[in-house]
Amino acid sequence: EAIPIKVGGPPPLSXGLPGTLNSDEARDLKLP
């Protein structure tokens, strides 16, 4: 259910930034 939320728009519970995919993916990849 996290995929549709990411594509839908900027999730405040995931990243909270207006980068959506960029912010979410970048953060996820950067996280250990």
Curated annotation (Swiss-Prot):
What's an example GO cellular component term for this entry? photosystem II
Protein keywords: Chloroplast, Membrane, Photosynthesis, Photosystem II, Plastid, Thylakoid
Q: Which family does it belong to?
A: Belongs to the PsbQ family.
**Keyword flag Chloroplast:** yes
Q: Which InterPro entries match?
A: PsbQ-like_dom_sf
Q: Which Gene3D superfamilies match?
A: Oxygen-evolving enhancer protein 3 (PsbQ), four-helix up-down bundle
Disordered: annotated span: 1-32
Q: A biological process (GO) annotation for this entry?
A: photosynthesis
Task: Give compartment(s).
Answer: Plastid, Chloroplast thylakoid membrane
What name does this protein carry?
Answer: Oxygen-evolving enhancer protein 3
Q: Which domain of life is it from?
A: Eukaryota
